[in-house]
Regions:
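Small-residue hotspots at the loop-to-helix junctions and early N-terminal turns
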Residues: 42-53, 127, 131, 194, ...
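Short runs within selected transmembrane alpha-helices of multi-pass transporters and secretion channels
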Residues: 66, 134-152, 160-168, 193-209, ...
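Transmembrane helical elements of multi-pass membrane transporters/channels
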Residues: 14-33, 133, 144, 167, ...
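Small-residue-rich hydrophobic transmembrane alpha-helices
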Residues: 47-104, 108, 141-160, 273-336, ...
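Short alpha-helical transmembrane segments in multi-pass integral membrane proteins
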Residues: 1-16, 73-139, 170, 186-243, ...
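Helix-terminus/linker motif at the lipid-water interface of multi-pass membrane proteins
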Residues: 24-47, 115-121, 177-188, 250-283, ...
């Protein structure tokens, strides 16, 4: 039966809102760690930022296998193939486990590469202490991502939301106790933050594993029954679909990191303004990312069921919803820049006025790249739903690194546009990515006959 556009929109909202909420909660978890370490000490804050960034970069690369579980399981559900549902999920967890274990030596010797990146000796030493503990969390963090993908593909996004919200609260309590040494706990500084992170990741995995494996409505999938048995065909499919997803995420993170580094060359006020404007843009981006995850599931279900009409109509609705939200954020960024920036600043401090003045310009540019950023992440979600990841990886690489970063550099330092030039480069790179990826999806999407 043909679905109306309204029914597609409702289905996307039901699936997508909890995912959006879980992404925002995950951001809140990282922000709370930053706030606590910032109150403990400047060096510790620097360690938390650089250590957290190192962990995140490795996580992004490895998360591709976990993210590949979502479209594969969704397509299997669309085909009513329960055997493949559990096999894809298991092999996604196998690959996540293997990647997490293989990367731990990198964290064990992190002092050497932190020094190589130009960090001060004290920051590098404490950074290694942090990562030697937090690095053990890579395995549960990736397994959690795989289980979230599995549950999202089955439409069980509410549990993902509430588990993530619970993790934020538990992390804050443990981190506060161990960083500052309150309630009878030892004062451990950055090591306390690492222990809190590891504990919460492990606890979240246990909660989701129990839910996914033993909830009566899901028990018939037998997710953990004979978990040790390999399925080489399913493992190969997850691997082939997943590694380009991880590389694409790494390249996008690299684009924004490179712009941040270049902004630091310009000045401290400019870098601070950039950081705040980027935080505001990131909050808005979480909505588009949640919609992208939801549309991956919906597209996978339609593709598995062989329903080209539902697939294409669902894509149109997702694009329209993302554009509508993007236009709302454009209006807010242009109408209330000072109010938005003030949320992140103590306006009593003298330097805040300079940051707000410069940040207002950057928020106007953030309004420009909102739609491009939204369209490229929605297109990536649609392409993953039809299991197309390798060509999109190369398209993203071209857009981010051959177009975005060079344009940013030339406009900023050859045409003397400074930070404005850097952000214009982001606008151009993301717009090119959006155009190429959308063209790829509509070229590859099944035709209605």
């Amino acid at each position: 039966m043909t679905q109306s556009y309204a029914s597609h929109a409702r289905a996307l909202m039901v699936l997508g809102l909890p995912i959006i909420g879980s992404h925002l909660a995950q951001m809140a978890l990282h922000v709370s760690d930053t706030i606590l370490l910032g109150r403990y000490g400047v060096t510790e804050l620097a360690v938390g930022v650089i250590g957290g960034t190192g962990f995140f970069v490795v996580f992004i690369l490895g998360s591709g296998f976990a993210q590949a579980v979502m479209p594969l399981v969704a397509a299997a559900v669309g085909r009513n193939d329960e055997v493949q549902v559990r096999r894809y999920a298991r092999m996604g967890m196998w690959l996540s486990l293997a990647f997490g274990l293989m990367t731990y030596p990198l964290f064990w010797v992190s002092e050497s590469w932190l020094l190589g990146l130009g960090q001060k000796p004290e920051v590098a030493r404490l950074g290694q202490d942090f990562l030697r503990i937090a690095g053990w969390g890579m395995v549960p963090a990736l397994l959690v991502m795989a289980l979230k993908s599995y549950l999202a593909a089955l439409g069980r996004t509410q549990v993902v939301l509430w588990t993530t919200i619970g993790a934020v609260g538990v992390n804050f309590v443990i981190a506060y106790a161990l960083i500052f040494g309150v309630w009878g706990m030892p004062e451990m500084g950055v090591r306390g933050a690492a222990i809190a992170s590891l504990s919460v990741q492990a606890g979240t995995f246990v909660v989701l594993a129990v839910y996914a494996g033993w909830l009566p409505e899901l028990r018939h999938f037998h997710l953990f029954q004979r978990f040790w048995r390999p399925d080489w065909q399913a493992l190969g499919q997850v691997f082939r679909l997943g590694w380009p997803i991880g590389v694409t995420g790494l390249m996008e993170a690299g684009l924004f990191s490179a712009v941040s580094v270049m902004m630091g060359w310009i000045g401290t006020v400019e870098l601070a303004s950039h950081g705040i404007a980027m935080q505001a843009a990131a909050l808005a981006f979480m909505v588009h990312l949640g919609l992208s995850n939801a549309v991956t599931v919906r597209t996978g279900l339609a593709e598995g069921a062989g329903d080209a009409r539902a697939l294409r109509d669902g894509a149109k609705v997702a694009i329209a919803m993302s554009v509508a939200f993007g236009l709302v954020m454009v209006a807010l960024f242009l109408a209330f820049p000072v109010a938005i920036l003030s949320l992140f600043l103590d306006m009593a401090k003298p330097e805040s006025a300079q940051i707000v003045a410069y940040g207002t310009v950057l928020l106007a540019l953030a309004a420009l790249f909102q739609l491009g950023d939204a369209m490229q992440v929605i297109a990536l979600g649609l392409l993953r739903g039809i299991r197309d990841t390798r060509v999109p990886m190369w398209a993203a690489a071209f857009s981010y690194w051959v177009v975005g970063i060079p344009v940013s550099y030339v406009l900023a330092f050859r045409f003397d546009l400074g930070g404005v030039g850097l952000w214009l480069g982001l606008v151009v790179g993301l717009a090119v990515a959006a155009g190429m990826l959308m063209w790829r999806f509509w070229l590859r999407a099944p035709r209605v006959v």
